[in-house]
């Protein structure tokens, strides 16, 4: 800068020395903070004074006054001082306040006034509303075009399709300049917020965290996603840095910096400091051809101002360039005035005197200036009827991403006052924006969505799972990389009492992560603070419980009938037996009175019960039913037996061959009604919040949710709820606990269980889905959603699901969850009861037999041995043969073939020669010959003890009976006794009264006694 000043000094001195001889004298007023305006003005005068083609031999002289910023009174004083010296025109570069005061003065004195509006403190300028002249003659010409930033911003937000954004402005910016923009935005339905930024920007952001609640701070973060900065370049740089350092900015933020004056180095500083996308709107000027870049209207401009390679040009402000062109415009007017020979000499004017008349050449000079048309450093300059320069052009720059240069700026479009927008402001395809980027991913361990893989010591953790496979597929398709880490608290995300969020949702809100992936469900509460992609898997809630143990009962054969039925059957058998016994006794009495043969069976009670039991088990009976009453009883019993046995057989077959899970819990309604099993879910999870919302809703008609929530929330959830899903799964495996959680998670736990001891009861109560959570307003959401839909269409997602949830795994989830329609083979335990009954019967029979043997043995030993009254069988046979008819053939019977049985010989005294007749009244004994060769025509006679029998049976008084051999009981209750074979000996026998022996009843049997 000092070198430039030294270079300009000779020319400045030359201008000052010729001032007295020059007829061209102009005045200039600059503010004290605009040092470059002074230097550029002097440089412009020097260039024009050296150009003989414009002013010929005339030279321009000038007088410069420096005033304080925004001091209208001082500006008027200095202007009056210049007018006293005599000036042809006044060139000023001030703010709007000084410009309004100078406008009134120049209009009154008819001094042409070329006004260049300055940016206040580097902030965007607003239009200066100059006061109209009372007589309608405006001598103030605005060299700098009117502010068109409102038009550019409105077109920009329309192209970007913004519906809600915030505009930040500093104290130097006049907010009244936004009135037209706000009016048009309101008509378009745009939600625009305004916020003033103080000079101490760090204090602004610090106060946000102390004055705002978490919910308000989250909303403020959301507003920063779409922001327009009406700040100075330095202020915008500080503002963005503070936003990034305080985590209020994110990668999806879009900053729009609007300022006519910003240099290329300042733009690069903004781009590299900003997090997210940056759009810059600035004013540009058309560049001339290379061979004419320093030539303007036959005027050669100094290379310091026209050559872009010169560093000084980059240091100039737009007001400096318009100031140079204003001097060039005056020189062009002076040139035409001199050529037309219509020159008006300068006049000394006194502003204080009331009698002072305006300059009479002012109108002519003003008209000459208005008719001028030049092409200077700012392009075309000319003035319209409203005394404004209409030509202005803006450049819109946007950030780009490349692997070579990283983040950079490129030209998106231009805007000019004639054609409007030329180009597109739409964001570049997100795929190219994700290419090469590294995203931070937060996750929570949840099998099988995210699990820790086998890691190598010293290297970062590696993860696997269904969600990781989906993320890898998206990263491969979109070309981005990711760094994954676990949420510090291991939670998905729940809103706390202070309206803040924990877990993965909290990481996204605080901008520490770009996206979150795991078994995270899409809920309305979460969607209010973050964005979600399209669901990549459906979601429902299921019940994880321990499989019911198969109950093995050896007496399952009794299951077809209830205990009451078995009791009635057991009672019916003896009742019917007693009835048959009674009817049989009645029948026996009638048989004796009518000399009819009485029944041979069911004569005793236990025999009657035995017959009834045999009929019940379909084994038949031994009695012949003769009476009608007994036939009715037995017929009814047989019909009863048929129905009972048929029903038992059918029900037993169905009970044993068709197996059904003995699980009383099949739905959430069943779970809420039972009291034996406790149940719960993870505290502060999406499932927990769902049950709370449904259970506490007074409009909910289904009382199931109220019952479920009452149990889940018992003691604040501490009794039945768990802190994480792994704990809930372990608790369910132990039994007597039902874990309510995502079906996908519990199904995987059931499929991979070592003992296959748990099952899942699927009963979807919530139609949601799993998605990828992103920061609110993330530009990547639509891209992720599109790729997920493509994975679904191609079937890649189904392949990944089959990988982690195989249909045929080691554990079968359907074996205890649905009714089996196919029969199965009967196991041994199903018939164990039958074999037990048989074994018990056999053991009981053996025990009874042993008891009978022991009883009979003791009875036989206790009885006194008696003499065996022997009969001389040879005499008996001889007597019988003599009584028989002579026509009937007979043979001698061997004494050894005659067996004396069933005689109660023990009742006879040893000295008795003849047994009394009365003792044989009802013995019904018969004597038969057992000769094999004569069995077809053997003769038998009945030995009657009646008085008509006169058969002499001598009994030997001296013969003694050897020891009796006890065999077994006879049918009539006596004991069979058999004497040893003896030689025929004579024995005495008492004749039977009544004569001869009667004929035997049955001739087919031999003679027996």
Swiss-Prot record:
The chain crosses the membrane at residues 563-583, 638-658, 831-851. Residues 1-20 form the signal peptide. One of its GO terms (cellular component) is trans-synaptic protein complex. Disulfide bonds join 80-351, 96-128, 294-306. Residues 931-942 have a biased composition (Polar residues). GO terms for biological process: negative regulation of synaptic plasticity; phospholipase C-activating G protein-coupled receptor signaling pathway; regulation of postsynapse organization; regulation of postsynaptic membrane neurotransmitter receptor levels; social behavior; synaptic signaling via neuropeptide. The record marks 73 as: Essential for dimerization. Residues 943-958 have a biased composition (Low complexity). Residues 931-960 are annotated as: Disordered. GO terms for molecular function: G protein-coupled receptor activity involved in regulation of postsynaptic membrane potential; GABA receptor activity; identical protein binding; metal ion binding; transmitter-gated monoatomic ion channel activity involved in regulation of postsynaptic membrane potential. Residues 21-562, 659-830 are extracellular. Equally in forebrain and cerebellum. It is found in: Postsynaptic cell membrane. SMART domains: Lig_chan-Glu_bd, PBPe. Ca(2+) 2 binds at residues 753, 755, 757. Its main location: membrane. It is a multi-pass membrane protein. It comes from the Eukaryota. InterPro entries: ANF_lig-bd_rcpt, Glu/Gly-bd, Iono_Glu_rcpt_met, Ionotropic_Glu_rcpt, Iontro_rcpt_C, Peripla_BP_I. Gene3D superfamilies: 1.10.287.70, 3.40.50.2300, Periplasmic binding protein-like II (3.40.190.10). Keywords: Calcium, Cell membrane, Disulfide bond, Glycoprotein, Ion channel, Ion transport, Ligand-gated ion channel, Membrane, Metal-binding, Postsynaptic cell membrane, Receptor, Signal, Synapse, Transmembrane, Transmembrane helix, Transport. Member of the ionotropic glutamate receptor family, which plays a crucial role in synaptic organization and signal transduction in the central nervous system. Although it shares structural features with ionotropic glutamate receptors, does not bind glutamate as a primary ligand. Instead, forms trans-synaptic adhesion complexes with presynaptic neurexins and cerebellins, regulating NMDA and AMPA receptor activity and influencing synaptic plasticity through signal transduction. In the presence of NRX1B-CBLN1, forms cation-selective channels that are proposed to be gated by glycine and D-serine. PANTHER family: IONOTROPIC GLUTAMATE RECEPTOR. Homodimer. Interacts (via extracellular N-terminal domain) with CBLN1 (via C1q domain), and more weakly with CBLN2; the interactions mediate the trans-synaptic adhesion complexes also with neurexins and are required for ligand-gated cation channel activity. Belongs to the glutamate-gated ion channel (TC 1.A.10.1) family. GRID1 subfamily. This is Glutamate receptor ionotropic, delta-1. It comes from Mus musculus. The gene is Grid1.
């Amino acid at each position: 800068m000092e070198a430039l000043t030294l270079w300009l000094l000779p020319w400045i001195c030359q201008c000052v020395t010729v001032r007295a001889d020059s007829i061209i004298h102009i005045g200039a007023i600059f503010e004290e903070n605009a040092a470059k305006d002074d230097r550029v003005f002097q440089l412009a005068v020097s260039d024009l004074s050296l150009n003989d083609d414009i002013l010929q031999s005339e030279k321009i002289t000038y007088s410069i006054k420096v005033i304080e910023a925004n001091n209208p009174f001082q500006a008027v004083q200095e202007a009056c001082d210049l007018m006293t010296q005599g000036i042809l025109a006044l060139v000023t570069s001030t703010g709007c306040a000084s410009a309004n005061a100078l406008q009134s003065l120049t209009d009154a004195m008819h001094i042409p006034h070329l006004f260049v509006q300055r940016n206040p403190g580097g902030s965007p300028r607003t239009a200066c509303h100059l006061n109209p002249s009372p007589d309608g003659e405006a001598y103030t010409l605005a060299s700098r075009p009117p502010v068109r930033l409102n038009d550019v911003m409105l077109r920009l937000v329309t192209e970007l399709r913004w519906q809600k954004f915030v505009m930040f402005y500093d104290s130097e910016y006049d907010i009244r300049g936004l009135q037209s923009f706000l009016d048009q935005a309101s008509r378009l339905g745009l939600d625009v917020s305004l916020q003033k930024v103080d000079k101490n920007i760090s204090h602004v952001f610090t106060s946000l965290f102390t004055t705002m609640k978490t919910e308000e701070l989250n909303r403020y973060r959301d507003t920063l996603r779409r922001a327009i900065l009406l700040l100075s370049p330095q202020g915008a740089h500080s503002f963005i840095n503070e936003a990034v350092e305080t985590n209020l900015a994110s990668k999806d933020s879009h900053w729009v910096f609007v300022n006519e004056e910003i240099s290329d180095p300042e733009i690069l500083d903004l781009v590299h400091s900003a997090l997210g996308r940056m759009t810059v709107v600035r004013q540009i000027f058309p560049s001339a051809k290379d061979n004419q870049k320093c030539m303007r209207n036959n005027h050669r401009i100094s290379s310091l101002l026209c050559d872009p390679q010169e560093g000084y040009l980059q240091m100039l402000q737009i007001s400096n360039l318009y100031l140079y062109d204003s001097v060039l415009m005056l020189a062009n007017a002076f040139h035409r005035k001199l050529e037309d020979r219509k020159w008006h000499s300068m006049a000394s004017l006194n502003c204080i005197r009331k009698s002072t008349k305006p300059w009479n050449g002012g109108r002519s000079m003003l008209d000459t200036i208005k008719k001028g048309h030049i092409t200077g450093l700012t392009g075309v300059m000319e003035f319209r009827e409203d005394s404004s320069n209409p030509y202005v052009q803006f450049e819109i720059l946007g950030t780009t991403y490349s692997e070579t240069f990283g983040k950079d700026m490129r030209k998106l479009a231009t805007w000019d006052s004639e054609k409007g927008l030329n180009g597109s402001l739409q964001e570049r395809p997100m795929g190219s924006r994700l290419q090469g980027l590294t995203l931070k991913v937060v996750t929570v361990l949840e099998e099988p969505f995210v699990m820790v893989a086998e890691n190598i010591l010293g290297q970062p953790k590696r993860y696997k799972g269904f969600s990781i496979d989906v993320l890898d597929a998206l990263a491969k398709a979109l070309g981005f990389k990711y760094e994954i880490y676990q949420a510090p608290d291991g939670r998905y995300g729940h809103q706390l009492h202070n309206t803040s969020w924990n877990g993965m949702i909290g990481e996204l809100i605080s901008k520490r992560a770009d996206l979150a992936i795991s078994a995270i469900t899409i809920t309305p509460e979460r969607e209010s603070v973050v964005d979600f992609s399209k669901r990549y898997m459906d979601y429902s809630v299921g019940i994880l419980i321990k499989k019911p143990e198969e109950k093995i009962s050896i007496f399952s054969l009794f299951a077809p009938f209830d205990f009451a039925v078995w009791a009635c059957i057991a009672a019916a058998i003896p009742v019917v037996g007693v009835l048959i016994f009674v009817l049989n006794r009645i029948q026996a009495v009638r048989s004796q009175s009518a000399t009819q043969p009485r029944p041979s069976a069911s004569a005793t009670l236990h025999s009657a019960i035995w017959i009834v039991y045999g009929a019940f088990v379909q084994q038949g009976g031994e009695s012949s039913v003769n009476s009608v009453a007994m036939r009715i009883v037995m017929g009814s019993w047989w019909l009863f037996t048929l129905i009972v046995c048929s029903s038992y057989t059918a029900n037993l077959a169905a009970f044993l061959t068709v197996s059904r899970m003995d699980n009383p819990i099949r739905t959430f309604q069943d779970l809420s009604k039972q009291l034996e099993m406790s149940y719960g879910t993870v505290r502060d999870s999406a499932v927990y919040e769902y049950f709370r919302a449904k259970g506490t809703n007074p409009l909910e008609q289904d009382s199931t949710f109220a019952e479920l929530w009452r149990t889940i929330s018992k003691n604040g959830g501490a009794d039945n709820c768990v802190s994480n899903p792994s704990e809930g799964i372990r608790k369910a495996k132990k039994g007597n606990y039902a874990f309510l959680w995502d079906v996908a998670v519990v199904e995987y736990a059931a499929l991979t269980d070592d003992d296959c001891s748990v099952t899942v009861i699927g009963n979807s109560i919530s139609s949601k889905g799993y998605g990828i959570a992103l920061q609110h307003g993330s530009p990547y959401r639509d891209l992720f959603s599109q790729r997920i839909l493509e994975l679904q269409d191609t079937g890649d997602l189904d392949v990944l699901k089959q990988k982690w949830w195989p249909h045929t795994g080691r554990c079968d989830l359907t074996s205890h969850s649905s009714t089996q329609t196919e029969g199965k083979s009967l196991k041994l335990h199903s018939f164990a009861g039958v074999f037990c009954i048989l074994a018990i019967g056999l053991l009981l029979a053996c025990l009874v037999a042993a008891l009978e043997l022991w009883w009979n043995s003791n009875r036989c030993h206790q009885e006194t041995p008696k003499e065996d009254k022997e009969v001389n069988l040879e005499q008996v046979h001889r007597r019988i043969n003599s009584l028989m008819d002579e026509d009937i053939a007979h043979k001698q019977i061997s004494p050894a073939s005659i067996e004396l049985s069933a005689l109660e010989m023990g009742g006879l005294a040893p000295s008795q020669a003849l047994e009394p007749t009365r003792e044989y009244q009802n013995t019904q004994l018969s004597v038969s010959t057992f000769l094999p060769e004569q069995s077809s025509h053997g003769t038998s006679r009945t030995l009657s003890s009646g008085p008509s029998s006169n058969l002499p049976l001598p009994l030997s008084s001296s013969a003694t009976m050897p020891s009796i051999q006890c065999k077994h009981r006879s049918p009539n209750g006596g004991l069979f006794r058999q004497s040893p074979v003896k030689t025929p000996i004579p024995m005495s026998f008492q004749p039977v009264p009544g004569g001869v022996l009667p004929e035997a009843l049955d001739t087919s049997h031999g003679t027996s006694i």
